[in-house]
């Protein structure tokens, strides 16, 4: 088996299931992935700064607040335990305690964590290399090839695949594409189904007399914008988002070797008037200094759901080609278990007891592909109203 992956560096270390913004099966899957990561990291003492802190979603408008309340009522009728994991806070004292006094209200979810994603991935890769070297048989099963570009795929008549790379060719029965934003380079027929979108993150210097934030934050607006924030313990504020201020909102941008100046400035100013960083009697800074600014390329799915499973011939696949990609900037509470699920499919173990089943929305089908033709964009309020409707 050959795995090709896009390890993108934009990730800001914000892991939180969107329990009220997804269908119930998807919310349950994301919560399961969060619990899986929490257990994995704790059981192996993985040094990746993982800390469960609870997540706050400030709500800016009355219309969005009403839509969220109605959505939670519908969830409660079908899955009361899931609905109980989401709290709506509206009182001035509650919002002040969360440092978002100017908000119309706020969502609080205890199931949210911050971490250093690179450290987590590096630990896993190091463990795979180490365990492979210690294998009793002496046979190497894991081969890590970094800085090796996949240039093309070729299917042979006997069912094998040839992967053309910058270092030669590989012939294999099965290929897994974890290529996310760059999927259409190898599968041109998926152009438009997964689109590259550049995200930008800043490590902002905690201001003088700034206090340690106790929670992570995410701001979602009706126009499709999303900002997300974690505060490293005794370190910088890691803020990502603000891409809507860039020309074209960074949609279709696949280069991560530059930062957008307008986005960078907006990130430095974004928290002013939005989040209280200092002690109550201290005046806030209208702009923060940035120690580091960087970008990474996200894979946005046309219907906001990942693509997981066997790639059909209509998309350039056939027997032996698999995919897990298209996380729409929300891979942290998703990708770990979609990866497990597709690996089980490849080994024919998807029906065994304990196998990880992905939601129907993630599965690849001709019906899903057809339904995306001419799909209209929806606002966040419209999306909330549509979820779980009969």
Language-model segments: which ranges?
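Helical element adjacent to the flavin cofactor pocket in flavoenzyme catalytic cores
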Residues: 74, 78, 100-173
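Glycine-rich active-site loop/strand segments that organize a redox cofactor
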Residues: 4-29
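N-terminal Rossmann-like FAD-binding beta1-loop-alpha1 element of flavoenzymes
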Residues: 1
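Rossmann-like flavin
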Residues: 22-127
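C-terminal lid/capping helical subdomain adjacent to the catalytic/cofactor pocket in oxidative enzymes
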Residues: 148, 157, 161, 304-307, ...
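Active-site lid/adjacent beta-loop-alpha segment flanking the redox-cofactor pocket in flavoenzymes
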Residues: 189, 193, 210-320
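Flavin-dependent oxidoreductases
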Residues: 149-237
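General small-molecule cofactor/ligand-binding pocket signal
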Residues: 85-90, 143-145, 289-293
């Amino acid at each position: 088996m050959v795995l090709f992956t896009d390890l993108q560096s934009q990730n800001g270390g914000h892991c939180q299931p969107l329990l009220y913004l997804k269908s119930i099966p998807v919310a349950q899957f994301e919560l399961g992935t969060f619990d899986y990561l929490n257990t994995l990291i704790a059981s192996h003492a993985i040094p990746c700064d993982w800390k469960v802190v609870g997540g706050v979603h400030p709500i800016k408008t009355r219309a969005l607040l009403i839509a969220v309340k109605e959505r939670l009522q519908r969830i409660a009728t079908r899955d009361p335990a899931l609905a109980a994991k989401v709290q709506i806070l509206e009182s001035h004292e509650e919002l002040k305690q969360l440092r978002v006094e100017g908000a119309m209200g706020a969502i609080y979810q205890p199931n949210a964590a911050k971490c250093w994603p690179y450290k987590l991935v590096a630990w896993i890769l190091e463990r795979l290399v180490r365990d492979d070297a210690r294998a009793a048989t002496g046979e190497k099963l894991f081969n890590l090839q970094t800085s090796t570009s996949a240039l093309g795929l070729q299917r042979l008549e006997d069912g094998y695949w040839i992967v053309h790379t910058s270092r030669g060719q590989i012939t294999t029965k099965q290929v897994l594409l974890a290529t996310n934003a760059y999927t259409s380079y190898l599968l041109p027929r998926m152009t438009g189904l997964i689109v590259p979108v550049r995200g930008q993150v800043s490590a902002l210097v905690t201001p003088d007399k700034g206090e340690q934030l106790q929670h992570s934050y995410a701001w979602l607006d009706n126009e499709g914008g999303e900002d997300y924030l974690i505060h490293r313990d005794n370190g910088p504020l890691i803020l990502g988002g603000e891409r809507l201020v860039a020309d074209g909102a960074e949609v279709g941008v696949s280069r991560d070797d530059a930062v957008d100046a307008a986005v960078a400035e907006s990130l430095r100013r974004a928290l002013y008037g939005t989040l209280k960083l200092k002690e109550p009697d201290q005046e806030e800074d209208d702009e923060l200094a940035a120690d580091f600014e960087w970008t990474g390329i996200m894979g946005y799915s046309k219907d906001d759901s990942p693509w997981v499973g066997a790639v059909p011939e209509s998309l350039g696949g056939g027997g032996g080609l698999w995919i897990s990609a298209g996380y729409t900037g929300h891979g942290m509470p998703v990708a770990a278990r979609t990866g497990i699920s597709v690996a089980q499919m490849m080994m024919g173990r998807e029906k065994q007891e304990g196998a990880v089943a992905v939601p129907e929305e993630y599965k690849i089908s001709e019906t899903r592909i057809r339904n995306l033709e001419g799909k209209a964009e929806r606002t966040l309020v419209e999306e909330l109203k549509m979820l779980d409707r009969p």
